Swiss-Prot record:
It is a multi-pass membrane protein. SUPFAM superfamilies: SGNH hydrolase. The lineage of its organism: Bacteria, Bacillati, Bacillota, Bacilli, Bacillales. GO terms for biological process: lipopolysaccharide biosynthetic process. This is Putative O-acetyltransferase SAR0937. Its EC number is 2.3.1.-. It comes from Staphylococcus aureus (strain MRSA252). The active site is at S459, D581, H584. Keywords: Acyltransferase, Cell membrane, Membrane, Transferase, Transmembrane, Transmembrane helix. GO terms for molecular function: acyltransferase activity, transferring groups other than amino-acyl groups. Belongs to the acyltransferase 3 family.
Length: 604
């Protein structure tokens, strides 16, 4: 290269509206998924689309700067990234923190911790440490979506340094591309290995090391298909091939958005990698200056949405988290979704116009009191109403209003020695006083000493454990949060093998946390021999609900000693039975489910 390092002028890379169009598709998929998982079960794949785009675009920018000037100014790159990303995030954190304090003060400690993690762009590792499940929506976590921004920011910090080092030490770029491809394979292998050991979704889904594969595929494409070297008018056959491959890949990707769900395990065994390769083909076609698919993705509507994709991504999940927290999940009225969408659009547009654009163009100068972007009065209101409480939240001034919500909830309910139960203290939140009469006392009026059932279940069983034990003192109850049916077989073999006689009664409440197979269900049922088995079906706003209930109903039809307890039917239309997550039970729900189980047990 005949150039003087550091002095040749850097020519800005051409704008590629097709990428904005692809961003629009990705963010719309994510928003629809978070509004209601069952509308677009694989919408979360939009995050991977963003990862591939980021890897491709950032690498292309850095390579072009290196080709034009002979150097890459790392400091300038990092400043541009901060100007682009940080201001909007800080405003989001201030708004969410203040809103949590005003509307959801019980959650202020948890949200404060999430805010601190987000400020330092380590949200993904924070959620791994706290064993948070991305696909589980039982908890109020309005900042959980920032895990992906944390991964991208970590990538922006370390990748340019590695790229510069490789460019200076390795002259053949195809060798550099092979190095990144090798690292992507290592990342893929790490995801497969960790997942195979313990099936831990959280670790492999949130981990920078396991998600690096997707970003690096974008990096590799930048080496193979740099946008600044593409010909404006290639042969027609070349354009036809590019359009055909890109179109077919896009169709397959959209189909996967509808087919894949959060219970699809093969995505952790190479699925994310293959899906990202599809995205590579789409990117290659939409960034080409002469393809018709690029023109389709460059239409004004998609470009408009794509330019605001960052703001839409930032705000949609926070809005949905707050709004949906006032409704029972799975029983949300249609008009609520219009509220979600309207508020998301409003906040995103305000952020784009008054935060993103000014700071991207002017940097810190956007805070100048004489700036035309934000009038002085509005600026003062923002500082007073958001910044001050935000700082107080960070220093823990409002911790007294928060609660250790996770610590307050029982993780298990296990009664194995009947005599010990008389010493157990009923939880205060199970006692409701209306006037001077305790509902707990009313509930305990009927006691059944003539039955000795075994009850095994998940968190719903934990919910009813105290109440059921008070009514059936000789019952044996084993409930654990997060328990799945396939995990129960070893438990039964180890602890409950004696429940095999025709006089025994066994209640199984499983299926809240995931699907299972016919074989897994039959293996469990066969452990109880001739015992009378009662299967409680589930009400859970998840994609697997229908299949779980179908398998349980089929088992009751196939086996003469199995009876179905239809909790799904009993709870239909009774939102008062449920906590906001639509699964766990409020007091009335506890009584209703206990009643259903007792009715079935008393019949035999």
């Amino acid at each position: 290269m005949n150039k003087t390092k550091g002095f040749t002028k850097y020519k800005k890379m051409r704008y590629m509206p097709g990428l904005d169009g692809l961003r629009a598709i990705a963010v719309l998929g994510i928003i629809i998924y978070h509004l209601n998982k069952q509308w677009l079960t694989g919408g979360f794949l939009g995050v991977d689309t963003f990862f591939v785009i980021s890897g491709y675009l950032i690498t292309s920018l850095l390579l072009k700067e290196y080709d034009d000037t002979g150097i890459i100014k790392l400091k300038s790159f990092w400043i541009r990234r901060l100007k682009r990303l940080l201001p909007a995030v800080i405003v989001l954190l201030m708004v969410v923190g203040t809103a949590t304090l005003l509307l959801k003060s019980d959650n202020i400690i948890r949200v404060k911790h999430d805010i601190i993690a987000a400020i330092f762009y380590v949200s993904n590792w924070w959620y791994i440490a706290k064993d948070v499940n991305y696909f589980e929506q039982f908890s109020f976590m309005p900042l959980k979506h920032l895990w992906s921004l944390a991964i991208e920011e970590q990538f922006y910090i370390f990748f340019p340094v590695i790229l510069v080092t490789l460019l200076l030490t390795i002259k053949k770029r195809y060798k550099i591309g092979f190095i990144f491809w090798g690292v992507s394979i290592i990342s893929l292998g790490l995801m497969m290995f960790i997942y195979s050991i313990n099936g831990d979704h959280s670790r492999v889904y949130f981990g920078t090391d396991t998600r690096l594969q997707t970003l690096l595929l974008g990096v590799i494409l930048a080496f193979l298909w740099p946008p600044f070297k593409l010909k404006n008018d290639p042969p027609k056959v070349v354009k036809y091939v590019i359009d055909s491959i890109g179109s077919l890949s896009f169709i397959v990707l959209i189909l996967l958005f509808f087919i894949i769900n959060d219970e699809t395990n093969w995505i952790y065994d190479g699925g994310f990698y293959l899906i990202s390769i599809l995205t590579l083909f789409i990117i290659a076609s939409v960034v080409h200056p002469s393809t018709w698919i690029a023109k389709i993705f460059s239409n004004p509507v998609l470009v408009f949405i794509g330019k605001r994709s960052y703001s839409l991504y930032l705000w949609h999940f926070a809005v949905i988290s707050f709004v949906h927290s006032y409704y029972v999940d799975g029983q949300i009225p249609v008009y609520v979704y219009f509220i979600d969408i309207s508020l998301t659009i409003i906040f995103a547009e305000l952020s784009y116009r008054f935060i993103e654009t000014p700071f991207r163009k002017e940097g810190i100068k956007a805070l100048n009191w004489r700036s035309s972007y934000i009038p002085q009065f509005i600026r003062m209101v923002i500082v007073v109403t958001l910044l001050i409480p935000f700082m107080l939240i960070l220093v823990g001034a409002f911790n007294k209003y928060g609660k250790d919500i996770i610590g307050e909830k029982a993780n298990s309910f296990d009664t194995t020695i009947e005599d010990n139960y008389s010493m157990r203290i009923a939880p205060i939140d199970n006692i409701h006083i209306d006037g001077l009469v305790s509902e707990k006392k009313k509930e305990s009026s009927d006691v059944y000493n003539n039955i000795k059932p075994l009850l095994i279940g998940d968190s719903v069983m934990v919910d009813i454990g105290e109440s059921f034990k008070s009514s059936v003192p000789k019952s044996r109850i084993d409930g654990k949060v997060g328990r799945q049916l396939y995990q129960t077989l070893p438990l039964v073999k180890a602890n409950y093998s004696q429940y095999k006689k025709s006089s025994d009664q066994v209640v199984l409440e499983l299926g809240t946390n995931g699907d299972f197979t016919v074989k897994q269900l039959d293996d469990l049922l066969n452990q109880f021999g001739k015992a009378k088995i009662y299967l409680v079906n589930t009400r859970v706003p998840r994609i697997y609900e229908a299949n779980v209930n179908r398998l349980l109903a089929d088992a009751a039809k196939r086996k003469s000693n199995v009876t179905l307890i239809d909790w799904y039917k009993r709870s239909q239309g009774h939102s008062e039975y449920f906590a906001p997550d639509g699964v766990h039970l409020e007091y009335k729900g506890v009584l209703a489910l206990k009643d259903e189980i007792l009715k079935a047990l008393k019949k035999k």
